[in-house]
């Protein structure tokens, strides 16, 4: 789950959202190609899919749009921002006086909701440049409508906003927030999400692992079997639980309160993380993030984490 997705660093004009890693990728690809970049690779921009009255944010739209405006302002001060929206003129009115419009691009496109990390393209790199892998997003296992969100990546490529080889992977359900790459041949994911019967229920774990290894050219997949956040619609996306960092490091959510409903599951997750090994057979450096205090919104638990 996530409201934004990074767009890798451009190798051409800074005014284009061309997907190209430049020198960093060139050095990487001399060793291994193709590869699925890690989260910390250089990027040229960020995609936001903007909230509107037909999204699930309708009941608090003004408050949420204010939050998105703040996010857009911070992004556009630093890098290019792609805003996907069915109403670009309305969004321009909202942000024009606040956001650096020189760094903003718009894609007019119908959308169901705002979860760009999950419905956006997943980018592979090789010596010839970027490939934009377009998987099916089915509303986290058919929980929510997603037919419009599934058109965004194709429209962005057809309109020349995202430049790269478009790769149709719509025969497989996969969200960006459900996998984590270290950029060196290892994927981290969760069993609850990827083995959900409402995603790729016709495939078993072995078949899914073989498919992911083939598509992403990775050598190992680490499956977390435990861990969740109450109120999370994604079926335990890895990006809410554990993330790769440079130097064989994994940061993860830790719960030390034995009275918390998450305690047993997150303790089991932590134990499994200690059992994981790098491709060189070494244990990972594990850094625990404190579990944030509970926030209740209209009687329901609001999943969140602390970020420094």
Regions found by a protein language model. Give the residues of each.
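N-terminal export leaders
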Residues: 1-2
């Amino acid at each position: 789950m996530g409201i934004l997705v990074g767009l890798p660093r451009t190798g051409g004009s800074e005014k284009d959202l061309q997907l190209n890693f430049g020198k960093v990728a060139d050095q990487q690809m001399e060793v291994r190609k193709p590869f699925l970049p890690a989260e910390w690779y250089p990027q040229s921009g960020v995609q936001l899919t903007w909230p509107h009255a037909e999204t699930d944010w309708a009941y608090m739209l003004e408050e949420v749009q204010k939050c998105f405006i703040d996010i857009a302002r911070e992004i556009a001060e630093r890098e290019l921002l792609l805003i996907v929206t069915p109403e670009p003129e309305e969004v321009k009115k909202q942000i024009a006086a606040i956001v650096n419009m020189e760094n903003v691009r718009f894609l007019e496109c119908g959308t169901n909701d705002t979860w760009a990390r999950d419905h956006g393209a997943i980018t592979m790199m090789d010596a010839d440049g970027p490939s934009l892998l377009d998987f099916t997003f089915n509303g986290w296992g058919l929980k929510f409508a997603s037919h419009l969100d599934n058109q965004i990546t194709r429209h962005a490529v057809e309109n020349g906003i995202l430049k790269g080889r478009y790769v149709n992977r719509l025969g497989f359900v996969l969200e960006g927030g459900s996998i984590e790459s270290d950029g060196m041949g290892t994927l981290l994911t969760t069993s609850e999400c990827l083995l959900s019967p409402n995603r790729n229920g016709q495939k078993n774990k072995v078949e899914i692992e073989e498919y992911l290894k083939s598509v992403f050219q990775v050598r190992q997949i680490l499956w977390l079997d435990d861990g969740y956040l109450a109120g999370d619609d994604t079926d335990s996306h890895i990006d809410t639980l554990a993330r790769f960092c440079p130097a064989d490091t994994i940061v993860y959510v830790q719960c030390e309160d034995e009275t918390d409903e998450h305690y047993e599951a997150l303790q089991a997750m932590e134990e499994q993380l200690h059992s994981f090994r790098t491709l060189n057979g070494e244990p990972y450096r594990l850094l625990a993030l404190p579990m944030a205090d509970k926030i209740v919104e209209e009687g329901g638990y609001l999943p969140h984490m602390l970020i420094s």
